[in-house]
Swiss-Prot record:
UniProt subcellular location: Cytoplasm
Name of the featured protein: Eukaryotic translation initiation factor 3 subunit G
Pfam families hit by this protein: eIF3g (PF12353), RRM_1 (PF00076)
Annotated Gene Ontology cellular component terms: eukaryotic 43S preinitiation complex; eukaryotic 48S preinitiation complex; eukaryotic translation initiation factor 3 complex, eIF3e; eukaryotic translation initiation factor 3 complex, eIF3m; multi-eIF complex
Primary role: RNA-binding component of the eukaryotic translation initiation factor 3 (eIF-3) complex, which is involved in protein synthesis of a specialized repertoire of mRNAs and, together with other initiation factors, stimulates binding of mRNA and methionyl-tRNAi to the 40S ribosome. The eIF-3 complex specifically targets and initiates translation of a subset of mRNAs involved in cell proliferation. This subunit can bind 18S rRNA.
Entry-linked SMART domains: RRM (SM00360)
Subunit (UniProt): Component of the eukaryotic translation initiation factor 3 (eIF-3) complex.
Length: 290
């Protein structure tokens, strides 16, 4: 009876051992090639023998101290207790990607996607009055730059001189009748009040015509900057079309020193620039043009 129980127990143990996979074995031959034999189950639940031959070579690399310390950390999780190095059962070895930081100047700027057309409540497309973009004028990103030269594009790109007539000045000498009267029109006033643009109007300004439409403000400054020896170069603006922003071949350049402006006019007037002959002359107020 005891022999029968012992035989039954051995039969069950043999059945359990038959379902287990044999252990993985490794062997190295005289040529240094390691043969790794492992077992696995395929899709049909059959045992499959996998043989891999690997040639191992010692490769020495220099790493930082912190990286060397991380390699000494004990493994955890599914790799706990396993030898150093990646285990193919739990680790996917990919391609090494080398990260290189490029200078900011060499990074290509990503072109912004074209804005979708903004429509007004009436259903019409909204067009900016400054840059003709499809957005409201109040939200134009170039509002400050374009608004600063709107007066130049109006008619000749110069400010008008405000002249107060004698009758208007005399009118302010009487009774105001409870209404606000500007200081320039009050009793005892000699003329117009101070203007914010007085310092700008008093600068010696040159009018440049026959300018290439491809020239930019930076090119204009580079052309006139060498003559600014007694003072700084003031404004250098190119008159552009209000809608297309294309140059009209007209520009205005101001100097702090009249002597510098005269030298620039004498040297550049009639000079060839970008296949055109420049015409440089004094800029005259709108009322004095001929």
């Amino acid at each position: 009876m005891a022999d029968s129980k012992q035989s039954n127990r051995d039969w069950a143990a043999d059945d359990v051992d038959a379902d287990e996979l044999p252990p993985t074995t490794e062997s190295t031959d005289a040529n240094g090639i390691t043969t790794i034999v492992s077992w696995k189950y395929n899709a049909d639940d059959q045992k499959v023998k996998v043989t891999r031959r690997v040639r191992r070579r010692l490769q020495v690399s220099t790493v930082t101290q912190t990286m060397a310390e991380r390699k000494q950390w004990p493994k955890f999780g599914l790799d706990k207790g396993k030898p150093p190095g990646p285990d193919r059962k739990t680790t996917i070895i990919g391609e090494n990607l080398h990260f290189k930081i490029a200078p900011i100047s060499k990074i290509q700027r990503v072109e912004p996607e074209p804005e979708t057309a903004v429509k007004a409540p009436t259903g019409k497309a909204v067009v900016c009055r400054l840059c003709s973009g499809q957005h409201y004028t109040a939200r134009c990103p170039f509002r400050e730059q374009l608004a600063a030269i709107d007066n130049l594009n109006a008619d000749g790109a110069e400010e008008e001189q405000v002249v107060v007539s004698g009758t208007l000045a005399a009118k302010g000498a009487g009774e105001t009748g409870g209404k606000y009267v500007p200081p320039s029109q009050r009793a005892g006033a000699t003329g117009a009040g101070d203007s914010m643009f007085r310092a700008r109007d008093e600068l010696p300004t040159l009018r440049v015509t026959s300018l290439s439409i491809d020239a930019e403000e930076d090119d204009l400054r580079a052309l006139f900057q060498p003559f600014a020896k007694n003072g700084k170069l003031g404004r250098a603006n190119i008159v552009r079309d209000r809608n297309t922003r294309v140059s009209k071949g007209l520009a205005f350049v101001s100097f702090e020193s009249k002597r510098d402006a005269e030298a620039a006019m004498a040297h550049l007037n009639g000079r060839g620039y970008d296949s055109l002959i420049l015409e440089v002359a004094w800029s005259q107020p709108r009322g004095e043009r001929t």
